A protein has these predicted regions:
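Beta-propeller blade repeat segments, especially FG-GAP/WD-type strand-to-loop junctions
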Residues: 1-2, 43-65, 69, 107-126
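Intrinsic-disorder/low-complexity regions
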Residues: 11, 19-25, 30, 50-56, ...
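Terminal helix-to-tail segments of small alpha-helical proteins
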Residues: 32-35, 46, 70, 88, ...
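Compositionally biased, low-complexity repeat tracts
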Residues: 5-6, 12, 31-36, 54, ...
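Disulfide-stabilized cysteine-rich extracellular repeat microdomains
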Residues: 5, 18, 49-52, 75, ...
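Short glycine/acidic-enriched loop and turn motifs that connect beta-strands
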Residues: 37-41, 101-105
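Repeat-based blade/solenoid architectures
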Residues: 1-15, 68-85, 128-149
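Beta-propeller blade termini
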Residues: 11-25, 30-33, 81-98, 141-153
Length: 153
């Protein structure tokens, strides 16, 4: 379960390279980014793939551990959180982009800082903005990711 088993508000999911997760052959694995749906605090969790032995039939098995958990908005905002990842050229990790499912068009971009062994994501609010006029757009906003380019690219 991405959140406690009793939570029934749904989960918004994205993938991204928020930790520098590589195997012994330098293959990089994407992390799972989960935004809590409506009915709870605006929590985002990041799950990192762990190395695991293959099953007896030779098929791979996958285990994930929680690498991060943070509130994308004030604790009393319980509309749910949409999530995406954004690639940053030249950086080891992606950003996480969040948008509320309801309550306004408040987009936030979280910088993918990592610590120690590059297995934990430490969120730092990089920027935020209103995607639309918040006085007229009172529903939420879906977010998407991709590669951040400069004006000269």
């Amino acid at each position: 379960y991405a959140f406690e088993e009793s939570f029934r508000g749904g989960v918004n999911v994205a993938t991204g390279f928020t930790t520098d997760n590589r195997d012994s052959s330098n293959f990089r694995y994407a992390d799972i980014i989960a935004g809590r749906g409506p009915g709870g605090p605006p929590e985002v969790r990041v799950f990192r793939l762990l190395d695991a032995p293959n099953l007896p039939n030779g098929l791979p098995q996958f285990f994930y551990n929680q690498a991060a958990s943070f509130l994308a908005y004030a604790p009393d905002v319980n509309f749910g959180v949409n999530v995406a990842s954004r690639f940053r050229p030249g950086e080891p990790t992606d950003d996480i982009v969040t948008g509320p499912e309801a309550g306004g068009p408040h987009v936030r971009i979280w910088n993918g800082q990592v610590i120690g062994d590059l297995q934990s994501f430490v969120p730092t609010l990089q920027s935020e903005y209103m995607a639309f006029d918040p006085t007229t757009h009172v529903t939420g906003v879906f977010v998407g990711g991709g590669q951040r380019l400069s004006a000269t690219e």
